[in-house]
Amino acid sequence: MAIEYALVVPGRTSPEEMASRLGLERGDFEVSKGVWTADLRRDRGFILTLRRAKDGYFESDDWTLEPDKYLHVGFRADKAAPPQVRDRNLLDLVERALATGDEDMAFIENGEVLVLERAGGELRRVPVGFWNNVEP
């Protein structure tokens, strides 16, 4: 079973804009029906997808997010990749997204575990198992 992560970016951020913010180019992606896919398994340990979506609902314990429109930045973790390397690479991209914009964002594991959130400019790390694999 794969581990899936999502960075949910409410608003109108486009896949093209986010790709650039993540240090990737249009040529790094295959685009089909509005879904941008970059196979980064060999170098980073995951497949990255970017897609616009609407009417989202995300829930974790007592936290919920219901964006009307949002960008879904998906990370499908390669189970063969070393977890520490893969998760550090994944977090590097999340941190880059945070550093290059001011939108609210939520980083979620397997569709149900909130790992990190920025809301109203405030950044909150949730104490979950993900952090065991990355150095601060």
Q: PLM features: what roles do these ranges have?
A:
Residues M1-G34, E135-P136:
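Short, extreme N-terminal segment that most often corresponds to the first beta-strand
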Residues A2, L7, T37-D39, S60-T64, ...:
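Generic structural signal for short, flexible, solvent-exposed coil/loop and linker residues
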Residues R12-S14, G45, P82:
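Generic "edge-of-domain/loop-turn" microfeature
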Residues E30-L40, A106-G111:
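A generic structural motif
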Residues G34-G56:
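Amphipathic, interaction-prone secondary-structure segments
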